[in-house]
Amino acid sequence: MKEKSKNAAKTRREKENGEFYELAKLLPLPSAITSQLDKASIIRLTTSYLKMRAVFPEGLGDAWGQPSRTGPLDSVAKELGSHLLQTLDGFVFVVASDGKIMYISETASVHLGLSQVELTGNSIYEYIHPSDHDEMTAVLTAHPPLHHHLLQEYEIERSFFLRMKCVLAKRNAGLTCSGYKVIHCSGYLKIRQYMLDMSLYDSCYQIVGLVAVGQSLPPSAITEIKLHSNMFMFRASLDLKLIFLDSRVTELTGYEPQDLIEKTLYHHVHGCDTFHLRYAHHLLLVKGQVTTKYYRLLSKLGGWVWVQSYATVVHNSRSSRPHCIVSVNYVLTDVEYKELQLSLDQVSTSKSQESWRTTLSTSQETRKSAKPKNTKMKTKLRTNPYPPQQYSSFQMDKLECSQVGNWRTSPPTNAVAPPEQQLHSEASDLLYGPPYSLPFSYHYGHFPLDSHVFSSKKPGLPAKFGQPQGSPCEVARFFLSTLPASSECQWHCANSLVPSSSSPAKNLSEPSPVNAARHGLVPNYEAPSAAARRFCEDPAPPSFPSCGHYREEPALGPAKAPRQASRDAARLALARAPPECCAPPAPEPQAPAQLPFVLLNYHRVLARRGPLGSAAPGAPEAAGSLRPRHPGPVAASAPGAPRPHYLGASVIITNGR
């Protein structure tokens, strides 16, 4: 009996083992693996396989007991599936509602160091960090659906991070905690719904399982990752305040690294994506590594780019405490919606760009307009038709100027004048003209200035007023420019550069004629047609520059001929008078506060006794002889009288004087 019982037990064990071996052969595993399985492993793997067939009835081949119908497409599908697992940077796993791992691919050994046989059929809670148990339970729990579905099965997307046990070396595994590695799991929760009593609202659902793909995050050492053209790296503190940025960020977002340093990453993220970034930041601080969702990083000039970041917490090698955050960022798109400005930084940047462009264009225009205004008014040098006589009374009395029209405009341009005289600013306190090449027998300098003239100027004048750069012609120009305009006496010159307007009297009555004359603010003079006017004096030759007095009047009739004769007699008397420039100098007369406007003739300004004060010394009688008289017709046209020569400077030379 004992032998029979021993033999029966042995036979039973052998049959049992044989059945287990036969069952192991039915498992979709290589024979090398199934031949070494124990009974517990075979039962565990078989149970998991049966659950998988319930979840994917059509994905695991034909049912037992049915003839296999293999075709060419089936063999291709099997080969394709094996290739997909090899190319997948991760592993596939299926977890039941109770946490049992129904299936996991053999590629899990590459990332975790754990074999497929060891993991299949066991609870996933045994291989994840204790702090992640609650999260895993929440993932496997389906809340009542918000909308009733007519479909019997539907799926709910899931994306989460787990710290799974890893037995690989820490150097190659990229471990963040002792023995655990962060795995990014993304997939869906499959739910099956059942109808009760054919009522849509009386239904229940069953959680079939979680299907997900686990992916390892990039290692924390940035030297182990090759940065491509669409990637950049930054290092930040634990509160995401940027400390260092790669130079590639300029090409991808427009920001310079110094523009983002010491600023938090939240400041440059689209407002709708800050919640996702905050959630990823929380997971990063808790689990040590995270992969963000796609979020929008604002561009410098407007719009945004889509970015996904792989961040890791770096620990201090000595204290093992969290030190900083290193993130590798993938820019997935070009700048979108460049015209949208969603932050104050973008607005200020665009304004600075516009102001920079405006400043650049303005500076270019200013550089072009900074050329002297007088260069536009340059005229050809006019040759003197009369040979110069050194130190003669003719040249001292002539008062030659380079441009007639500049009596009431800016000082004329001289070929030998220094640049500082040509390029005086509008706010300058200097009021002088360039020196003229006249052979004066004495040193000439700037004209004396009265206090009432520069009442609105600065009290102290520059030292340049003491330099010998003026001329007697400037004395008359200065005093005559400061006199108020009068409707009875106007200035007229026979030059195209004379200030002009449709109403000359209106131009001469400006509130500040000195400033208008200094800066050339008065428009050019346009003389009337020759048929409608004539000059009081015969004009000088076109090539002769003069400072003569001209006044436009209508054509003279017979009644006005005596008046012209009186003017000729006055000129003759002036020519016989001694030159004013040779007279001894006298103290400058003090001009009253308000002076009437006088004629432009220089000899009348300094010689005649009139509104300017006392007459010029040395010619008291000549001043009285300047008053116009009406000589008879015989005296005006005597045949033996010397024929006078008229010059534009109102100086008459008779018999070669």
UniProtKB/Swiss-Prot annotation:
Motif, Nuclear localization signal: chain positions: 367-386
Entry keywords, A to Z: Developmental protein, Differentiation, DNA-binding, Neurogenesis, Nucleus, Repeat, Transcription, Transcription regulation
Intracellular or extracellular location(s): Nucleus
GO biological process, one term: cell differentiation
InterPro entries on file: bHLH_dom, HLH_DNA-bd_sf, PAC, PAS, PAS-like_dom_sf, PAS_fold, PAS_fold_3, SIM_C
Domain PAS: 77-147, 218-288
Disulfide bonds listed in the record: none
Composition skew (Basic residues), residue ranges: 369-381
GO cellular component: a single term: nucleus
Domain of life: Eukaryota
Family annotation (PROSITE patterns): BHLH, PAS, SIM_C
Quaternary organization: Efficient DNA binding requires dimerization with another bHLH protein. Heterodimer of SIM2 and ARNT.
Protein name as annotated: Single-minded homolog 2
Organism, as annotated: Mus musculus (Mouse)
